[in-house]
Each structure stands twice: as C-alpha cells, then as structure tokens.
UniProtKB/Swiss-Prot annotation:
GO terms for biological process: atrazine catabolic process. This is Cyanuric acid amidohydrolase. It is an enzyme of class 3 (hydrolase). Inhibited by barbituric acid. Residues 115-251 are annotated as: RU B. Keywords: Hydrolase, Magnesium, Metal-binding.
Length: 370
C-alpha cells in the first residue's frame, strides 16, 4: 500500500472571487499546486438555486490555478475536486480549505497511530430523472467505496467525513426529462436540492454499512430513520454528477493531521461538538492538549422537520422571508463558532439523511506536532 502525506490549509477570503491567499501560499512554497486534491469552501451567497457565488468561486480558482498547472481552467476543474457551500449567515466567515496529497517513501520514525487521509471519486453524470432516486444512491455508494480505496482506508470505522457535491434540477432539466417521457422526483428546483442531497447521503450510508442496500425511491425524504453519521452533501447548479471526497484516518498516511467526528442530535447539541473536539485532543476554545491545534470544523445543519427542538416549537420552516437552511446555518454556525473560538468553520445547510432528523454530523481536523 502506498504511503501518502496530506496537507490541510484554511485560507480566509475577501469575496467568492478572492484567490490572493491561495496564490500567496503557492508563491511562498507552502502549497505545491500540483499536490492540490480538493478545495472545500464557504461563499457568501444565499445557498439556494440562484446562488452563483459557488460557481464564481470555482471559476476564479480554476483560472488562477490553470497557469500553475499548465492546464486549461476546464481541465483544472476535472483534476481537482471543488466543493463550494453557499451561505455564511450569522458569524460564519467565508474561507476555503485546501487539501493536498503527495506520496512519500515511508512514514517517519516515531509517527504513531492513524493519520488523516483523503480520497476522491466521481460518479457518472446523472439524468435529471435519476436525481433523488435509487440510481443516485447506488452510484454514490460505488463512488464512496472507490474514494475509500483512493484514501487507503479499508475499515468504514476509520471514515469520519464524506463530503459530496451533487446536482440539482432546473426547469430546463425537468423539461428534458419530460420530453423523454420521464418524470423527475420533483418539479421544484429548490426542492430538488433536498432530494439530491438526501439520496447522496443514503449512498454513503449504503457504502459504509450504516444501512442496507434495499432503499427504494420512496424512502428518500420520508424514512428519516435511515441516515449516515458521516455524510455531508451540498447541491449545486454547476454539475450533473456527484463529486465524492472521503476524509478519514489511515495507517498508510504520514500526515501531521488527525480527524474525528460526532453526531449532533439537534441544532443545539453542544455536547456533540465538544465530543468531536475531544476526539482529536481538543477542548472548548482555547483548551487543547499539548501539541494539538484546531485546523477546521465541518458540520451539517438543518431545521428539524417536525417543527420543534427538544419539545419547543421553532419557526424556521414557516419563515417566508428566510429559508430554513439559512436559519439552520446561522444557528449551528453560531453554536460551533462559540465552542471553537472562530467563525471560519464549514457549516452546510440541508442535512437530509445526514445524521438524525434535525441534527447532523460534525467533524474536526487537528494538527499534531508530536
């Protein structure tokens, strides 16, 4: 098995088109552009169907990296996995997290335990009528397994976060399916985001053995007892396939980072966030074990679909001015930021089948100096 070293760099941005921080790190030699495998980002759009800050950010990054790699911007987008999550409500701060990977001859002497590893895979392009249905679940499950192999992770227990970028429906895509005599899961562009996120998350659950493979189309957005504890899915208009990024710990990794996770049972589950921090030797800011430093936190958030949090009614689902996903990102983002001591954390809205209903997974990456 090959040995790899993974790097993780959190870079603040002044806007969705800001690449100055990344270019500065490349210029200083801190980041080798040829080693960049994935970029996860938070952009200050609305996180909805018409949030073009995600596409803008990807275009800016691809244009900036193209001459560094000797590729066209289109080729850069095929080479690197870009996952932009729109919506930095409340105290959430726009930023990108750059993951690099390079092969090394062996693990350094004295390096103990499993360390952070990353793997990537893509599904095929989906037909509009396949989104939110069994085909998307099955293809995603296969891609998760491929990404695990790419990361050198064999045991599902070592997988702590699976980030997926998935497609959504537009009126043109719905019409294309109809012209072929097929119906889509929904005709609502906004509603399709939930279907696509949910089916993708169930694909993760199937791949990791968190649920059986006998999931039907009717289970998506209905059987909320079926979920993955590590899936994080974000829908966007800019693609028609799923991009799958697996983050976990591997004995084949020589990185100076470690990842752990917990599952929030609801939007105010501070204990779960604290548990995730403790998994990697961290505590509520500024507490940490010697030789441990927080790099970033990744979490999912959603308004509880039953309309209540711990028995008290919430109004996030009834607000016609602000979507429930924006409410949830702001609430969970504030909670995590308070515990982490920073608003530059990755909190994504819409957690269908990603953790229990109303909750969601939370993962923490720490840098180890030992």
């Amino acid at each position: 098995m090959r040995t790899t070293s993974v790097g993780v760099f959190k870079i603040v941005t002044k806007g969705p088109g800001d690449v100055s921080g990344l270019m500065a790190m490349i210029g200083s030699g801190a980041i080798d552009p040829k080693s960049i495998l994935a970029v996860l980002g938070k952009t200050e759009g609305n996180g909805g169907v018409n949030d073009f800050t995600r596409e803008y950010a990807v275009a800016a990054l691809c244009t900036a990296l193209a001459p560094q790699l000797g590729l066209s911007p289109e080729e850069v987008e095929q080479r690197i996995a870009f996952v932009m999550s729109g919506g930095t409500e409340g105290v959430l701060s726009p930023h990108i997290t750059v993951f690099t990977r390079r092969e090394v001859e062996r693990r350094p002497a004295g390096l103990s335990g499993k360390r952070l590893s990353i793997g990537m895979a893509h599904t095929r392009d989906f037909l509009p009528e396949e989104l939110g249905r069994a085909a998307q679940i099955a293809e995603t499950a296969a891609a998760v397994k491929a990404a695990m192999a790419d990361a050198g992770i064999a045991d599902p227990a070592d997988v702590h976060f699976v980030q997926i970028k998935c497609p959504l429906l537009t009126s043109d895509r719905v019409e294309a399916a109809s012209a072929r005599g097929n119906k889509t899961a929904t005709t609502s562009a906004y509603g399709s985001m939930a279907y696509s996120r949910g089916a993708s998350a169930l694909g993760v659950a199937v791949a990791l053995g968190e649920t059986g493979s006998d999931i039907s189309d009717g289970d998506v957005l209905r059987r909320y007892d079926l979920f993955s504890k590590v899936a994080s899915t974000s829908a966007g208009i800019e693609l028609m396939h799923n991009v799958v990024i697996v983050l976990g710990n591997s004995a084949a990794s020589a990185s100076e980072f470690e990842i752990g996770h917990a599952v929030m049972n609801d939007a105010i589950d501070a204990a779960a966030v604290t548990s995730a921090l403790k998994c990697v030797g961290l505590g509520v800011a500024p507490q940490a074990e010697a030789g441990r430093e927080l790099v970033n936190i990744f979490a999912k958030a959603e308004a509880s679909p039953d309309g209540s949090v711990r028995g008290f009614r919430h109004t996030m689902l009834e607000d016609t001015d602000i979507s429930s996903t924006r409410h949830a990102r702001a609430a969970v983002g504030g909670l995590i930021a308070g515990l982490a001591g920073t608003g530059a954390v990755y909190v994504s809205g819409g957690a269908e089948h990603q953790g229990p209903a109303g909750g969601g997974p939370v993962a923490v990456i720490a840098r180890l100096s030992d």
